[in-house]
Structure formats: structure tokens, C-alpha cells
């Protein structure tokens, strides 16, 4: 029989909002659990680990992978419970006003409050809908770019027209032998200056889409493109194919939970980031509200605000927010450890 361990707060979603909220919940002395659908933490940033992020306050330009690593290290400061590879599909409010969360396998998580930090839902890359395409995924068919250097001196075809496709094309043009971009529309959805740059350093085929993959064994050697209006076909030789056709987002859990949504489908929240259900809070891309800041930094603020809301929901007499870390007793011992480590490094 499963032991019923109760947590103060269970956070669903391990992206920037969920990770920072996990850290801040530790500052608020909450017993916290973080549940993530994927096998590793990081959220949507996992799809673009080599993209450079400039807009996190106080940090120099850094890659998505580096930012994830730092957020994970920070999130584990107070030893939270972290569960990976778990898809929460049902939430039940119990008679004592606690919540029981169930994953796909029926495993239960018991909690006094919930924070939804799952973005627009579970992100799944849109795969190429061509028969037999999956057999090339082990070699040179890619749905994201995790290492730029594997495309060095290669002929690369990129299918897609959004920001990610445009950015990858510009980056790879610096190291690849040739970059070809195909898009089913004449216009690209990326930023105008980036699109102009892409057109100057790559070969563009519009409006074309991938019709057929040609390969030997598990590797693609050529691709047939078809004109979206006339059907005219052309074949190009390639060493690698990158497909970026957007993501499917599974957000049905929010609807089934009976939470109030805005007209655009995002969660409606109060000033303290509480949803329409008592004890259920939210932060990050899953929410919309007046003054919403669409930056990673905004997710941090919403996460901390939501945790403060949780703290007062559980204990109305609690302080409205935590003391800043520079004057917080919780960090006194940790600061001493850091000083000792720094002194030891200087002595060596």
C-alpha cells in the first residue's frame, strides 16, 4: 500500500517558473515537491539548449543549457522532492480541502496546495508526417538542435518558418557547408532582421514542403521538396535534416480540473496568482493577467508571488514574503560554507 506522505506544496512543471518556485518555497519553509513530465528539468528551454539568452537580470548572455543547469542547482538548495517522467492527469480535492494528484499510472501525490507551472501544456515537437520518417531519427533527422558542432561542414536542410527555424539557419550558416531552408508559406514568422539575414546566407525554397525522404539504411541522403500550390518537385542532396514545425501542447488537464480560463485559454489568476479553485496557484506561461511580462524574469516574479500566496493560504498569520537572502538566517550556514570553500581555493 502506498504511504500517504503529505506535502505543503506540489509544483507541476519543471521549467523556469517551476524551478525558481521550488527554490523560493524552500525559503518559505514549505515542504515542496516538484513533478515534471519529461525525463529532465528545464521545460521548453530543453528544445533550444544552445540558443543564447540575454534577458535574465544580472546574468551575462548564456546558453539555455547553462541557465537550466543553474536553475536546477538553485532549485535543489533546500532538498525538495523531485519526480521526473510523471504526467499528472487528474486532480481531486478531498473533503479536508487537501488535493490528491494522480499520474498516468495511477500513482498518487498528496498535497495541501498546488502550483501549476506547466506552460501552455506538455510540449511535444510536431513530427514529420511522412511514412518511414521515424527510422531516420537515430541518425540525421532532427527535431531540435542540441549541439551545433554536429552540423559542421555538412549540407543541412531546415524545414520550418518560425523563430527557431530562422535562428538555427543563421547560426548553422556560420559552420555548415550549405544551409537550405524550405517553408510552406512565402512569408516567415521570425523577426524581420533575422529573416533578412537568413535570406542572405542560405538558400530558400518557398512555398515548398518535404514530400519524400531518400536514404540508405538509417541515414537520409536526399530530400524531395514539393511546391505547395503547383506540386512541382525538386530534389536536393543533404547530410542532415532539421524539422521545426512547432509544438503540440497538451493542456486538457486544466480544463478537466474545472479551472476558470481566459478567452484565449490561459488560466485566470488573482493578484496573488491563485486560480478559481482555492489552494491551486499558477505561474509562468500557463497564466495571463494585466501587466503580464513575457520574459523568463517575469516567470520568476510570478513564481515567488504564487509561493507567497500559498504560504498565506496555508497559514494566514505568516509573513507576506520571505526576507531577502542577504538578511535571511536560512542562508547563514550556507554563506559560511561558501566562504570556506573560496578560502580553500585561494590557498590551493
Curated annotation (Swiss-Prot):
InterPro entries: FAD/NAD-bd_sf, FAD/NAD-binding_dom, Fd--NADP_Rdtase_type_2, Ferredoxin-NADP_redctase_2. GO terms for molecular function: ferredoxin-NADP+ reductase activity; flavin adenine dinucleotide binding; NADP binding. FAD binds at residues 36, 44, 48, 88, 123, 285, 326. Its EC number is 1.18.1.2. Residues 329-348 are annotated as: Disordered. Its cofactor is FAD. Pfam families: Pyr_redox_2. Binds 1 FAD per subunit. Belongs to the ferredoxin--NADP reductase type 2 family. Signal peptide: none annotated. This is Ferredoxin--NADP reductase 1. It is an enzyme of class 1 (oxidoreductase).
Amino acid at each position: 500500500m502506498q504511504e500517504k506522505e503529505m506535502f505543503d506544496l506540489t509544483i507541476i512543471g519543471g521549467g523556469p517558473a517551476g524551478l525558481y518556485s521550488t527554490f523560493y518555497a524552500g525559503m518559505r519553509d514549505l515542504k515542496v515537491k516538484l513533478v515534471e513530465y519529461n525525463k529532465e528539468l528545464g521545460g521548453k528551454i530543453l528544445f533550444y539548449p544552445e540558443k543564447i539568452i540575454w534577458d535574465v537580470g544580472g546574468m551575462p548572455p548564456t546558453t539555455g543549457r547553462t541557465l537550466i543547469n543553474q536553475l536546477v542547482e538553485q532549485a535543489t538548495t533546500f532538498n525538495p522532492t523531485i519526480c521526473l517522467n510523471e504526467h499528472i492527469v487528474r486532480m481531486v480535492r478531498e473533503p479536508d480541502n487537501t488535493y490528491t494528484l494522480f499520474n498516468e499510472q495511477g500513482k498518487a501525490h498528496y498535497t495541501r496546495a498546488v502550483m501549476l507551472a506547466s506552460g501552455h501544456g506538455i510540449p511535444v515537437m510536431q513530427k514529420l508526417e511522412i511514412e518511414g520518417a521515424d527510422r531516420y531519427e537515430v541518425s540525421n533527422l532532427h527535431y531540435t538542435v542540441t549541439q551545433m558542432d554536429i552540423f559542421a561542414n555538412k549540407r543541412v536542410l531546415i524545414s520550418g518558418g518560425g523563430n527557431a527555424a530562422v535562428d538555427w539557419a543563421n547560426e548553422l550558416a556560420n559552420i555548415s557547408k550549405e544551409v537550405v531552408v524550405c517553408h510552406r508559406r512565402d512569408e516567415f514568422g521570425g523577426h524581420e532582421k533575422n529573416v533578412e539575414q537568413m535570406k542572405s546566407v542560405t538558400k530558400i525554397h518557398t512555398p515548398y514542403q518535404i514530400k519524400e525522404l531518400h536514404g540508405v539504411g538509417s541515414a537520409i541522403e536526399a530530400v524531395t521538396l514539393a511546391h505547395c500550390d503547383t506540386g512541382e518537385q525538386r530534389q536536393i542532396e543533404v547530410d542532415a535534416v532539421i524539422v521545426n514545425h512547432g509544438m503540440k501542447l497538451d493542456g486538457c488537464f486544466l480544463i478537466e480540473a474545472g479551472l476558470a480560463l481566459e478567452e484565449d485559454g490561459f488560466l485566470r489568476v488573482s493578484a496573488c496568482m491563485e486560480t478559481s479553485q482555492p489552494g491551486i496557484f499558477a505561474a509562468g506561461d500557463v497564466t495571463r493577467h494585466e501587466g503580464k511580462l513575457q520574459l523568463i524574469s517575469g516567470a520568476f516574479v510570478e513564481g515567488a508571488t504564487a509561493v507567497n500566496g500559498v504560504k498565506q493560504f496555508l497559514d494566514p498569520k505568516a509573513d507576506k514574503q520571505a526576507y531577502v537572502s542577504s538578511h535571511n538566517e536560512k542562508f547563514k550556514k550556507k554563506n559560511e560554507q561558501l566562504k570556506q570553500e573560496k578560502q580553500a581555493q585561494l590557498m590551493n
